[in-house]
């Protein structure tokens, strides 16, 4: 490709509305164009990168027996109503809905579990067809509330999604492991830093679930890592620091605590450390259209994890109660809710199990109790893990080694769904005994646009984008001073040789000075620059510089050999070349 033929445009100035680095650089370098809020045109330059990414995805999924198809984007409401997700998604305001001329409701697909399950239910003829692995790479839609992060949180986005159907839980797990390894190979080929973490299934399902996170400073998600084990902070099981408590119970005391409502206030008032305080928070749980309130007790130096609470109590949604909701439902104020005679159902985190002689609020304004104890003063509640993990907590899945906390961006998610969807659509087969048996399902997805944006977030430097070699739009740029006929002639010859050898060079044939071309090449992130400058004119030596700054001096006769060593062979097979 010649730059004079490439339809692209770079900009000197950053978009002031770009909230993250990837949005700024992808727009500045001519990869995306904002069509509307959260909606982007993928330019020819971007599409070259996306095609290479999709080539890698297809190669790895086809290698494990995946079959590509294309599912519809327009979904009838009754399919989503069948699984109960129509109202769940609409309640969050994320679903694009419309009504056709027959007054039937439809939506633009945010995901495809319902559609693919209905399709398989009609075509599956018997057990011998299982397992089935179907996948697509397609556009999806979500009406995001604040689509400010470019491709990280767009309203229209490109995804690969896979669906597996199996004859048993064992076969479902085998398919899960195959997809997990395939996804690992995909991200390994990108040569980026990522971790696989245990995750919460959310609205998709409640089976085994893991996320792939690219590590970067954007910090959309917080992940806990200990050795080779990782978990999203929403799902991380952690063992906090343990403290020694009194063995002898002291007499309980009611204490007036005027306007003493925070942990810090209580520490100062009673002159005690926070781990001797029982903190109680009121949580609103939503079950469809019904709301209920529960109280959660936790050690005063720690925070609750709302995702764990939602999962444990099987709620659709979970949030901290507002001041008004606390007043209306408990008759007291925030900061004065406690476990003693609590008027709503009370649960406690495991951190509180061994606490003795603790301080807690008295369910009335300006009142606390001192030296409170389980069994004597309060019946023991139901304990569960409601703890939000922190750096330094011990990881039980890694021999109680400590956690480190990192920031990352979720780029892929894999789930075991069990029979949640297949039961709704009667997807099954007859077993050896002639009994009808339901299929077991898995769902998996890679955000193509999110992955590319995450690569930019992780690898970019002060000069611009740094693409992984495997997905860069071009293998190498050929640069010379515009108007220099000798350099131009050599550049044309090298360009032709590279094309004939199957590589994807970008010949910058614009009548611009070399310095301008160098900056453009760095901005758009091409892995190598072949520079035909003074050194070439004086000695005939080719100067090559990698995007990371590594420099090579190569004689023309050795250039083909250099290409074979440094330009990845896989690029020669890419549909973008």
From Swiss-Prot:
Keywords, alphabetical: Aminoacyl-tRNA synthetase, ATP-binding, Cytoplasm, Ligase, Nucleotide-binding, Protein biosynthesis
Keyword Nucleotide-binding: yes
Main location: cytoplasm
GO molecular function: aminoacyl-tRNA deacylase activity; ATP binding; proline-tRNA ligase activity
Listed GO CC annotations: cytosol
Domain of life: Bacteria
GO biological process assignments: prolyl-tRNA aminoacylation
Pfam families xref list: HGTP_anticodon, tRNA-synt_2b, tRNA_edit
Catalytic activity: tRNA(Pro) + L-proline + ATP = L-prolyl-tRNA(Pro) + AMP + diphosphate
Subunit structure, as described in the record: Homodimer.
Its biological purpose: Catalyzes the attachment of proline to tRNA(Pro) in a two-step reaction: proline is first activated by ATP to form Pro-AMP and then transferred to the acceptor end of tRNA(Pro). As ProRS can inadvertently accommodate and process non-cognate amino acids such as alanine and cysteine, to avoid such errors it has two additional distinct editing activities against alanine. One activity is designated as 'pretransfer' editing and involves the tRNA(Pro)-independent hydrolysis of activated Ala-AMP.
Protein name (Swiss-Prot/TrEMBL): Proline--tRNA ligase
Organism: Chlamydia felis (strain Fe/C-56) (Chlamydophila felis)
């Amino acid at each position: 490709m010649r730059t004079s033929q490439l339809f692209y445009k770079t900009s000197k100035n950053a978009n002031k509305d770009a909230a993250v680095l990837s949005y700024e650089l992808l727009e500045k370098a001519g990869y995306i164009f904002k069509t509307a809020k959260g909606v982007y045109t993928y330019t020819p330059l971007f599409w070259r990168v996306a095609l290479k990414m999709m080539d890698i995805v297809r190669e790895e999924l086809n290698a494990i027996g995946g079959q590509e198809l294309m599912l519809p984007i327009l979904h009838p409401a009754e399919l989503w109503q069948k699984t109960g997700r129509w109202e769940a998604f609409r309640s969050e305001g994320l679903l694009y809905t419309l009504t056709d001329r027959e007054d039937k409701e439809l939506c633009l697909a945010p995901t495809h579990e319902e559609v693919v399950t209905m399709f398989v239910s009609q075509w599956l003829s018997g057990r011998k067809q299982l397992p089935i692995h179907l996948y697509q790479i397609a556009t999806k839609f979500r009406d995001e509330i604040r689509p400010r992060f470019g491709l990280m949180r767009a309203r229209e986005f490109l995804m690969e999604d896979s669906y597996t159907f199996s004859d048993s839980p064992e076969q479902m797990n085998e398919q899960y492991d195959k997809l997990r390894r395939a996804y690992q190979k995909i991200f390994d080929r990108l040569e980026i830093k990522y971790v696989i973490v245990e995750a919460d299934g959310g609205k998709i399902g409640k089976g085994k679930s893991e996320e792939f996170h690219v590590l970067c400073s954007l910090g959309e998600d917080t992940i806990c890592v200990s050795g080779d084990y990782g978990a999203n902070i929403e799902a991380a099981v952690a063992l906090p620091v343990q403290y020694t408590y009194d063995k002898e119970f002291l007499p309980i005391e009611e204490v007036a605590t005027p306007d003493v409502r925070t942990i810090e206030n209580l520490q100062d008032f009673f002159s005690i450390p926070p781990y001797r305080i029982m903190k109680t928070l009121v949580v609103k749980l939503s079950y469809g259209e019904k709301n209920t309130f529960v109280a959660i007790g936790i050690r005063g130096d720690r925070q609750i994890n709302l995702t764990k609470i939602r999962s444990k109590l099987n709620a659709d949604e979970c949030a901290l109660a507002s001041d008004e909701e606390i007043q209306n439902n408990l008759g007291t104020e925030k900061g004065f809710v406690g476990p003693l005679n609590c008027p709503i159902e009370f649960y406690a985190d495991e951190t509180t199990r061994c606490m003795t002689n603790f301080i807690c609020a008295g369910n009335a304004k300006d009142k606390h109790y001192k030296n409170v104890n389980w069994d004597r003063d309060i019946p023991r509640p139901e304990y569960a893990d409601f703890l939000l993990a922190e750096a330094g907590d011990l990881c039980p899945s890694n021999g109680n080694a400590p956690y480190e906390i990192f920031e990352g961006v979720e780029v892929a998610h894999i789930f075991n769904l069990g029979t949640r969807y297949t039961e709704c659509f009667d997807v099954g087969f007859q077993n050896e005994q002639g009994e009808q048996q339901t299929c077991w399902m898995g769902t998996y997805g890679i955000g193509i646009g999110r992955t590319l944006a995450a690569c930019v977030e992780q690898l970019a430097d002060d000069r611009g984008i740094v693409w992984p070699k495997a997905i860069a739009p071009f293998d190498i740029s050929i640069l010379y001073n515009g108007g220099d006929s000798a350099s131009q002639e050599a550049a044309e010859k090298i360009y032709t040789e590279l094309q004939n050898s199957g590589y994807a060079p970008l010949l910058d044939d614009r009548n611009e000075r070399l310095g301008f071309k160098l900056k453009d090449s760095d901005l758009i992130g091409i892995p190598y620059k072949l520079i035909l400058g003074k050194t070439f004119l004086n000695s005939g030596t080719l100067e090559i510089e990698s995007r990371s700054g590594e420099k090579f001096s190569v004689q023309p006769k050795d250039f083909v050999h250099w290409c074979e060593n440094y330009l990845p062979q896989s690029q020669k097979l890419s549909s973008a070349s």
